[in-house]
């Protein structure tokens, strides 16, 4: 056990130690797990039981995992995991390590299983455009606190990072957008068609650029001049037979961590001075998992009248399900009493002109050579599922969430395609297509549905009637119009692209046609990845 872990455990209060012993992370028996990563037995433990636990005191720069992975700098973080720039001591390589939060240990096991399958396919198909798993293991702090660690190539950063600031804040050049989208669709074509995997979290944060940005080069430069390699070689010569004696090996590891901590001192100073280049990746908090039965895996026919829910029927189970999903002010009684909002006057899609030319921010956040000739990889399979094991819970980031998911209808692979279209629009304009924020105290789902119907078109009546959430989302007395929203005029993507983002008519027409193929509200008529790859808008991409 390393010095930092021993120190931390020695400083823990007795009550905290007892809490550690009690803590256990639940698993779902329907999940498929990698046999090499053990999972915990299920047991409910409240958040208060681990409130004294501080992960940063254990997982920190200079920490050595598996005897060979030296953590240099945290380069990404979300609700459920962190990503570290890592030095592989044995192979003398700089890599990326994803460390799953111990509370989501079994989600990490599921992700490893999925990425293992992806990586097996990728060995013989180099143009797959998905991250490849190089190694995985688990780190055990105590019997009940375990981390799943997975190793990947080091990338330059995500597209989200590129769009936040700098010269591409208001969108990327269209040839680059087309290249990225073609690579993304190529990866999804394989995931859906050959590997039976739904990603369910396609967004700019999860699309990585290949390359080595300046801040990573600076970290490597500082590490190289620290003399770690020479000190490590000297340490190994002092302990030639360390693997034959556990006590000697522990002593070796303690000394290794001393020289590792010394090696990253300048990197920590650089990090404190700059305090940049760590991406904060938002995650959706829903973690309760129920799974579709295999009988649900067919494409759903929303026009089948026999399965409509009657608004006058007893819907006890549905009400219970929706009470769990709604916010505190969104019980049906309160929604029915809210005033109808006129959202149309809040949105003038013709007045916000593109700011690309007038922007004074011309910085290259990532070297242009990695952008113009981009090679990308789809990442973060922590929310992914094999198709026949997909969750019943709400999936996808809010901004890229498909209408069938909002309506709580059966979803298929094409929910990922909806997300692709949203991402394509954002890459080309710098703006999120659907970004509901609960206008006029509306539920965000109602605001989201308004934006979808305003821009894309009306949701088919059959889908509205089929929705388990129809009482919360639609007003039957107004012909299943969106609840609490006044009548509004629709617009269209072609008009928005020309008037707001100054696309030429030809560019807008072609791009809007491509987007609408992926934004078909009825998933049965939405294009799949293979069909979109054949769309004329992508014809000029190599």
Swiss-Prot record:
Question: Which Gene Ontology BP terms does the record give?
Answer: regulation of mRNA processing
> Where is the Protein kinase domain positioned along the sequence?
69-538
Q: Where is the composition biased (Basic and acidic residues)?
A: 20-30
The UniProt keyword set, sorted, is: ATP-binding, Kinase, Nucleotide-binding, Serine/threonine-protein kinase, Transferase
- Chain intervals with Acidic residues compositional bias: 31-49, 295-314
Disulfide feature = none
Q: Which family does it belong to?
A: Belongs to the protein kinase superfamily. Ser/Thr protein kinase family.
Q: Per its record, how is this protein called by name?
A: Putative serine/threonine-protein kinase L205
Q: Which organism is it from?
A: Acanthamoeba polyphaga mimivirus (APMV)
